[in-house]
């Protein structure tokens, strides 16, 4: 599992350079679900985050602070309020 999709692609390249095949010899997964990798093969398993929701929460927190609300931050979202969606694709299929 990689910290993001781009790192997963780098790991895949390194594995391939050693003659390993994905997913037969090694499974690969990323984190981001970035559009630019839609054509990567085998399709990359990843975790998709609700970026629009994260943006809205960040905007609200910033607006409160700019308005002078220096409260305890209780109104701000915590990391537990954001949930990702696991998207399983071919890069993590079990070897046949």
Q: What is the predicted role of each segment?
A:
Residues 1-96:
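Flexible loop/turn connectors
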């Amino acid at each position: 599992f990689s910290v993001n999709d781009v790192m997963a692609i780098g790991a895949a390249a390194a594995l391939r350079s050693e003659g390993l095949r994905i997913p037969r010899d090694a499974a690969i997964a990323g984190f981001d679900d970035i559009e630019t990798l839609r054509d990567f093969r085998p399709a990359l398993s990843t975790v998709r985050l609700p970026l629009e929701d994260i943006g809205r929460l960040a905007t609200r927190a910033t607006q409160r602070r700019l308005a002078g609300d220096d409260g305890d931050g209780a109104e701000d979202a915590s990391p537990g309020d954001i949930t990702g969606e696991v998207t399983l694709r071919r890069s993590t299929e079990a070897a046949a």
